[in-house]
Amino acid sequence: MDLGKDQSLSKLHQTPDHHQEESHVPEVIGTWSLRNREQLRKRKAEAQEKQTSQWQYREKKHKRQRTGKRSERGRKRQQNTEMKVELPSQLEKEMMEKAPAPGEKEIEPPGSVTEVLLPAVSPQRVAPAKHLSEVGQESVTLQENSSEYQATAVQNQPSEICQDMAESEDLSPKMCQEIAIFQDQPFKMFRNMAQPEDVSPKTCQEDIAAKVLSSKTSEDTTDLEECSLEAHPKPDMPKASTLETYQKRPEPEEPDSETGQGIVETESFVSNTQQEMAVPKELATEIHQETVEPEHFSHKIYREIAMSKDPSHKTTQETSVPDKYPPEMYQETPGSEEYSLEIYQETTGPEAYAPEIYQETPGPEDLSTKTYKDKDVPKECFPKLYQEIGGPQDQDSKAHQEDAKDVYTFPQEMKENPKAEEPEIIEIPNVPQESNPENDIYSYVLF
């Protein structure tokens, strides 16, 4: 019975086990297999879809980028071609429009070139060239003028005149014309016209007239007056005096340096004029060594006497320029020989001169005679002195030999003497005028 029970139990145990095994195993296997297959299929399909979608999407992107690049390149090419086509068309249009304008411009430059060249050739057209609106053209013309002046000055004159001619750019156009004319002329003519710069054209003409009149009066006067003119050149007429002295002197040792000093005189009045006047001053000192030192007139008296020498009042006001020069020059230049009464008796007359000038002259004439009386010097000593020395030309020849050595060794006593003698001149008018017999002559001439 136990066996039966055991078998039945075993069968029962076995059967459910078999069922459980069969049911469990296929269920598990079946489910897993199905799931796996389905999942695999789904996954494959999804993967393929993704791949296809991604591939399509990538292809679309690539296509879009390629088409965009191609479009941009195509647009650029089209724009470049259009610009190339438009540029020549626009250039042609502009050239066609501007065709008359360049013709006018081509016609204008020759005129401007001639306007620039003509001032260099003919100095008469310097003024319109300078009045142009552009400052550059003015500077070019000025530089050309300065270069021409410097070149001609180096060829014709010493280095001192080059510096003076370099400063001629600031002159008026009329004076530039005159300087150009002087450059074209030979060197002798330029020496004769040594100082054309600071003198206006009107004063130049009047100086020439004054020189002609002075030459006529010098022929009438005695050797005394010639010596006085040579020994004491007037500062108001430097041209005439310097030219006469240069022509009469036989030894032209230093003409270039003297002409250079004459031109430099217009710029530096005090220093160079003292050097230039040193030669006649030394002659005057040699003449007056035997006599007392000459009188030194004051500035006003010297101006009035210079006015009496000139032919008319207007020429003296225009030619003589005493305001520019300091009063030291007038005090240094000895004027005793020039203004002696014997010369006035021979040269002056009531017909040749205006009465207004004579009203100014008697003051300095009386002063000259009274100063000689105060110093106890006779009036007749002047011709004796010139006779003893041997004439004015001998003095000039002797003095010229000593000029090269003693031009710059002028004694300082002559500069100090005018200051010491000025109070004497103030006291002179108190002396009575009746003692001089020659003053009666001049009072008669005045009235």
From Swiss-Prot:
Basic and acidic residues composition-biased segments: 14-25, 35-49, 306-316
Residue segments, region Necessary for nuclear localization: 7-86
Modified residues (Phosphoserine): S89, S122, S200
Spans annotated as Disordered: 1-91, 137-156, 210-280, 306-337
In-chain residues carrying the UniProt-annotated modification Phosphothreonine: T217
One GO cellular component term noted in the UniProt record for this chain: nucleoplasm
InterPro entries: Hemogen
Phosphoprotein among keywords: yes
Gene Ontology biological process: cell differentiation; regulation of osteoblast differentiation
Localization per Swiss-Prot or TrEMBL: Nucleus
Basic residues biased stretches: 59-78
Protein name as it appears in the record: Hemogen
Gene source species: Bos taurus
Organismal lineage: Eukaryota, Metazoa, Chordata, Craniata, Vertebrata
